[in-house]
Regions:
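Short phosphate-binding loop-to-helix
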Residues: 95-111
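N-terminal anchoring/stem segment of glycosyltransferases
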Residues: 1-91
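Amphipathic coiled-coil/heptad-repeat helices and related helical stalk/stem segments
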Residues: 44, 102-105, 125
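A short linear-motif detector with a strong N-terminal bias
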Residues: 37-39, 87-88, 95-98, 117-120
Length: 130
């Protein structure tokens, strides 16, 4: 079964306004360009590679900023398919990315027409799922 990762970067650029647990490390990144911590890249790699090894294809939904960032590290090669158009289009909407920071993910999930497994990028499946 196909799995999906989603990386919508628009909330990163509103990081000073993000509310909720887990955002302190993001707020402390001083970069004005999109960035992730090293451990985030590593768990993304582990998640995609383990899914492919044990369960099948994996697709990434991201935007142009996320695709450029992942390309720098060779991460796009981990995916069987990469879609930047969907989230590029969604990023043009008036949604408040700081308040609705998971909405890019939810829109991608609602966009699916076939069975799939959604994986947060820090979810690592190390066996075949039944």
């Amino acid at each position: 079964m196909k799995a999906i990762h989603v990386n919508w970067t628009k909330p990163f650029f509103e990081k000073h306004r993000l509310r909720g647990h887990g955002f302190e490390t993001l707020k402390n990144l001083n970069s004005k360009t999109y960035d992730q911590l090293d451990y985030q890249l590593l768990y993304t790699m582990a998640s995609a590679a383990n899914w492919k090894k044990h369960n099948g294809p994996i697709k990434l939904y991201t935007d142009s900023v996320g695709a450029s960032f992942y390309q720098r590290f060779g991460l796009l090669d981990l995916y069987d398919e990469v879609d930047i158009n969907f989230l590029n289009g969604y990023s043009k909407s008036n949604v408040d990315a700081a308040y609705f920071w998971t909405s890019g993910k939810i829109k991608c999930l609602a966009h699916q027409t076939e069975p799939f497994v959604f994986l947060d990028q820090d979810m690592i499946i190390r066996n075949k799922i039944p």
